[in-house]
């Protein structure tokens, strides 16, 4: 194996039956709380009184509207995408219908356009009367879905998750099917602490009138409250960091225990097409109740849905798998293929528009060039038979990957019991092509020892020291994750090699493309390989015997790319709220607007008045 690269190379309160009218009355609570735990509700929560039979009650609308923030551009349309309207009366009827089913482990049962996991029927509790919804509270407005807490007359509590309309109907349906099946697999096969799912709907053709997941409510506090990544080194700091890292590493270790027969994503047997139903997902299942429960179908990893609304589903279906376990390179190539097709589709739409913006045309053309380069180099990136990569065969075997392993998605139900939530976008892929959880991942310059790695550190001004300390703490946290991985799965530790990280960087950068100019990071990661290509070929790390770099770059092209990348990075750093895509928390948005810092333009968007920022500097914290 090559030596390590240089270190410095980032509450319907109570629902009562009205004896005269036969109607239900209700209180709906909207809360600003941003986690699905049982912390005390905010004093700012709004109560909305309504009758369940009055579907046209205008007071209901605000219960479904997005309220957690606003955007500088296209605010109305983005909030419209995040409206989560559903039928409250339909929910009540549906839940009572579930209560009439027999509790048994079987394939999800179709019920009024939705699907029920009858084996989890006990989540409804016990009552001689009808099961009635007593209250509904909005408890979380996330990036991809909204969460409501449902309280029943049995005393039981459920969570209703409604996805935002950010993707196509087909994509939303696939993601819901796969997430429920993945959660079910983690619970039944691996015995992990995850919420039990009671029912799900993949479209609006059900009594709830919306796609949804209805699942177990888990009480507790988020593990994130314990995460303090920038604490100085000490025994206490080490202990506190491990209190967060360890349970997540242990959870991952259990996930990695199963090797699958294909690359793709998990679904229930009946949720994949017939041609895929004969292939078991993994070998050695001895429980007859589980042997035909799950299957592997198309991948729901985010690159197959993010910003793909204008791409025909038939094209997406060509590239989203599933793939045979013997062909891991297809997983790599699929990303380049889907992004290239998406860019070409966008260019076709621009060319068909006589009034199209030439800057948009130029940008898409550059994207196409980059993704053509990615398509060319992807099959050569990593040699899946390399003798220089320890346990390379294990690293390329199909294993389950959960992209949102994060303390924000871990609920401490008790001092010794953690529950994991949110498995959207989970996929089966080679472990070598996965990335570390975002809360510990660091792609910047590594500093392992402040005094040894930073010349003159002791003599630096405090502000300069803090910059290097930040880099050191991020490096330290990532290393702690790697030590845990090595402890549990030493056979997979080669993923920590700096060279492996560099080689798979173009693939990972492509997975992270969110806006038009992010292609620059993809290109940059390809360019980075050029200097080391001969050494990688000599050490059989890449899937090529040709020492000539696969992409021909001119000096002019590289200079232009470097300038455009630098300009984009400067634009990102200097533009307010660029890191959040122009999204601003609502309380901050209202304050900035009142101060005249945010000003509405003629087109309905908002701009930042720099001079007003200088007139209204952020308030300094009071001395205590």
From Swiss-Prot:
The keyword Transit peptide applies. It comes from the Eukaryota. InterPro entries: Aminoglycoside_PTrfase, Kinase-like_dom_sf, Mito_inheritance_9. GO terms for cellular component: mitochondrion. Pfam families: APH. Keywords: Mitochondrion, Transit peptide. The keyword Transit peptide applies. Residues 1-34 form a transit peptide. It is found in: Mitochondrion. Belongs to the AIM9 family. PANTHER family: ALTERED INHERITANCE OF MITOCHONDRIA PROTEIN 9, MITOCHONDRIAL. This is Altered inheritance of mitochondria protein 9, mitochondrial. It comes from Candida albicans (strain SC5314 / ATCC MYA-2876).
